[in-house]
Every structure is written in structure tokens, then in C-alpha cells.
Regions:
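Activation targets extended, charge/polar-rich intrinsically disordered C-terminal tails
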Residues: 16-18, 54-57, 63-65, 181, ...
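Residue-level preference for non-acidic, small/hydrophobic
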Residues: 96-99, 114, 164, 194, ...
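Non-catalytic propeptide/linker segments at domain boundaries
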Residues: 30-92
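Glycine-rich catalytic cores of cysteine/serine-nucleophile enzymes that process amide/ester linkages
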Residues: 91-151, 174-185
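Active-site nucleophile-His-acid catalytic modules used for acyl/amide transfer and hydrolysis
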Residues: 148-208
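Sec-dependent signal peptide cleavage junction
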Residues: 3-22
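Short extracytoplasmic/periplasmic juxtamembrane "stem" segments immediately C-terminal to an N-terminal membrane anchor
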Residues: 25-26
């Protein structure tokens, strides 16, 4: 007698796909498991790989980032239970410099990055407003936030900042797991805004690991970025 396990294998794959999509969506507030799966399907088609392999990489990258974020939170004594916007103010800095602060949603310290569009202004993408430009001291940050310079020419830094400002009004996107593979125009999150700006205007990839998604800490750990100030 020959036993067939093909049906069981299909069900197992479906179950794993659903689990990955559900866990990813829980870490990306504002997205649904169905949207995650659709995004994976489209990217899998482009890359000629399986949807399951893309979902697995999405899941691996975002859970790894979560672990890193929670380690940082525990070292700094911050709660991972969400909500804090910080009590420190950003200082003035040079146009084209960037900043990073810890930031929480869905019990996950994903971090947040923005760019100086002038010595006294920043441009960033945030939920609700999308891409916006505000006064430097309008942004509250956590202790141990950092300001970084990017290793390109002043002209390139300024061009990157100007491009970011040109995107003011773009909506916010909660999609981090696949943001390297979406268009430079339209909805974008904080790390996608900076990544696109320097890719298009300075010709560099400031994503340190080159995964499917670029996260805030991927930028701060890039060989192109260097910390010049810690805020505490």
C-alpha cells in the first residue's frame, strides 16, 4: 500500500504561510496578513522564487530587528510595552545629517530616523502625517539618540535632503519588510525616505545588510554613516 502525504504537505505550507504573514502583520501595525502575502507573491514573481521563501525572509529580517530593538531597550532601561516619544529635543545640525531615536509600536522598538533639511529643520516620515518638514526642536527623542553624518560630499548630502523635502506630503507606509522593492515616489516610511534620498542623489546604498527591507538601524549601522553626537 502506498501512502500519499502530498495533501498534508500542502496544508503544512499553507499553515506556515499564514503564520508568517500573521506574525509579520502584528509587527507592522497598519498592514494585514493578506497584504503581506500579496506583497510576497508579487516580489516572488519578480525574483522567480517561491512566495514561501520571500515570506520566510520577510519574517527572518523583521524578527531579527525586533530582537535587536528589545536588546537595546533592555540596556537603556526603556519599556518595550510601547508608546514613548522621548523627552529630549534634537539639536541643530548640518543639512543632510541624519538622526536616530528609539521608537515603539506593537511592543517593538523599531527605531525612527529622519534627516536635517536645514540647520534648524528636519524632514521625516511619520504615521498620520506622512512625509513632513518641521523645526528641529519640534521632534522629541529618547535618551541616547544619535546624530550621524553620511560619508558623501556636501553637495550630495544637500541634494539628498532637498529630494526628501520634495516628497513632503507623501503618505506614510507601514511596509518595512519590502520597502526596498517599492517605488521611490508615493507612500514611504522613515527609513525608506532616507534610503531613497541617498540612493538617488548620492548613488550609495545606506542599508547595511541589503535585505528585502531597510530598517532604521540598518541605516545607523551602515559603513556610510558615522555618529557625531549622542543626545543624553
Amino acid at each position: 500500500m502506498v501512502l500519499s502525504f502530498s495533501g498534508m504537505n500542502v496544508k503544512a505550507k499553507e499553515s506556515e504561510t499564514a503564520r508568517y504573514a500573521k506574525e509579520i502583520a502584528e509587527l507592522q501595525q497598519g498592514t494585514s496578513p493578506q497584504e503581506v502575502i500579496q506583497s510576497a507573491k508579487e516580489l516572488a514573481k519578480q525574483k522567480h522564487v517561491t512566495t514561501e521563501s520571500i515570506l520566510k525572509q520577510f519574517h527572518s529580517e523583521i524578527t531579527s530587528d525586533k530582537v535587536q530593538g528589545n536588546v537595546i531597550a533592555s540596556k537603556t532601561g526603556l519599556s518595550v510595552m510601547g508608546g514613548s516619544s522621548g523627552t529630549k529635543k534634537l539639536p541643530k545640525s548640518v543639512k543632510g545629517n541624519i538622526y536616530y531615536t528609539n521608537s515603539y509600536t506593537a511592543f517593538y522598538n523599531h527605531g525612527h530616523v529622519g534627516m536635517y533639511s536645514a540647520a534648524d529643520k528636519i524632514v521625516e516620515s511619520v504615521p498620520g502625517d506622512g512625509v513632513r518638514q518641521i523645526a528641529y526642536n519640534g521632534r522629541e527623542v529618547e535618551d541616547n539618540s544619535i546624530v550621524q553624518t553620511v560619508s558623501v560630499t556636501d553637495t550630495q548630502k544637500q541634494a539628498a535632503a532637498d529630494w526628501a523635502v520634495s516628497r513632503v506630503g507623501d503618505e506614510y507606509s507601514f511596509n518595512f519588510v519590502n520597502n526596498r522593492n517599492t517605488g521611490h515616489e508615493g507612500a514611504k516610511n522613515c527609513s525608506k525616505l532616507l534610503w531613497s534620498a541617498f540612493l538617488l542623489k548620492a548613488g550609495i546604498d545606506i542599508d547595511s545588510n541589503g535585505g528585502l527591507g531597510v530598517y532604521p538601524r540598518d541605516i545607523t549601522s551602515s559603513p556610510y554613516t558615522k555618529t557625531i553626537l549622542t543626545i543624553n
